[in-house]
Curated annotation (Swiss-Prot):
Family the entry assigns: Belongs to the TRAFAC class TrmE-Era-EngA-EngB-Septin-like GTPase superfamily. EngB GTPase family.
Positions contributing to Mg(2+) binding: 42, 64
Coiled-coil spans in chain: none
Residues that hold GTP according to the record: 35-42, 62-66, 80-83, 147-150, 180-182
Cited function: Necessary for normal cell division and for the maintenance of normal septation.
This protein's name: Probable GTP-binding protein EngB
Cofactor: Mg(2+)
Length: 205
């Protein structure tokens, strides 16, 4: 497979959907971004694409309840899933959302990878582990980005990355763990390389 290098700066907004059933047809390749409401998901997407307002960062965690789709190239889509685990969202809504999220991760044919974003200071909460579990059971590769890495010293950062790498071994999946900071541009290149790899089957001769 030839190595490809997509230009993520050309990424543009495609559409929003109120729920999993409303997202566009199951074609091309999709890569989903998931994370707790305050994990810095929108910030990471904006850093990857070098666009300040591509993904709206909300001052109110849990506000982004829509699924937002972005197109990098024709048939190459990034899917921004609503933040999970925010207390102010009604319990019934949470349960419904988690159910459809599990279905999406396990049944969506064009889904090629999952990026899970977690605050480096509070990684692997219950719902993060649930996401990883669903992905692994669907044979979906996972990139765990430990966000806000600039909040820790370099040695503390390395320690956290090592701890998370050891903690995920029992999942026995294809899981890569990297530190990430939009502010200090840590891990953006590694994210782009991983996305290129996941999108590459579309460009195979």
């Amino acid at each position: 497979m030839s190595e490809i290098k997509l230009n993520y700066h050309k990424t543009h907004f495609l559409t929003s959907a109120p729920n999993i059933r409303s997202i566009p047809e199951d074609t091309g390749i999709e890569i989903a971004f998931a994370g707790r409401s305050n994990a810095g998901k929108s910030t990471a997407l904006n850093a990857l694409t070098n666009q300040k307002n591509l993904a709206r960062t909300s001052k109110t965690p849990g506000r982004t309840q829509l699924i937002n789709l972005f197109e990098v190239e024709p048939n190459c889509k990034l899917v921004d899933l609503p933040g999970y685990g925010y207390a102010a969202v009604p319990e019934q809504m949470k349960i419904q959302w988690q159910k459809s999220l599990g279905e999406y991760l396990q049944k969506r044919e064009c889904l090629a990878g999952l990026v899970v974003l977690m605050d480096i200071r509070h990684p692997l909460k219950d719902l993060d582990q649930q996401m990883i579990e669903w992905a692994v059971s669907a044979n979906l590769p996972v990139l765990l980005l430990l966000t806000k890495a600039d909040k820790l010293s370099q040695s503390a950062r390395s320690k956290q990355v090592k701890m998370v790498r050891e903690a995920i071994l029992p999942f026995q999946g294809d899981i890569q763990v990297e530190a990430f900071s939009a502010q200090n541009k840590i891990g953006i290149d590694k994210l782009a390389v991983k996305l290129d790899f996941w999108f590459s089957p579309l460009f195979a001769e």
